[in-house]
């Protein structure tokens, strides 16, 4: 029993440190800190991702996702290609379906796996729009998502534990969306 309690405390301490690091890094990352090469590459990734979404616009899953997203909202976000306005989460969902459907989006191969990190852009676009942000905010939040997705899988071999590396995608989406919304360190944590 004492061992289980120590293990629980160790996990809680580790999670607290990770949360503290991610929230601190998220609020400290500024567009002005990004090298021009990173900004240019991120612009290309965002444009490519929007192209993937538009290419999948007429697919059956995309139509279903847009139909599911027909919900009015006081602070709406836009579904790519349609002008449809809905809740930020449903816009991110519908956009994410379109971004991912054709499987033409980017891929990363890391030490312990990989993933399609441009999937995370759906989680960035809606909050940037809702807070009336612009390209700089979208680029900064996208870079943040990519950094989480590229670096975390190289530190932990989730595949050996039968976990998919997209677990990090969920974390990256949450932190990047929080950055895009302009949340404080405390609100992110």
Predicted regions and their residues:
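Short, Lys/Arg-enriched N-terminal segments with co-localized hydrophobic residues
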Residues: 1-14
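N-terminal core-entry segment
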Residues: 15-189
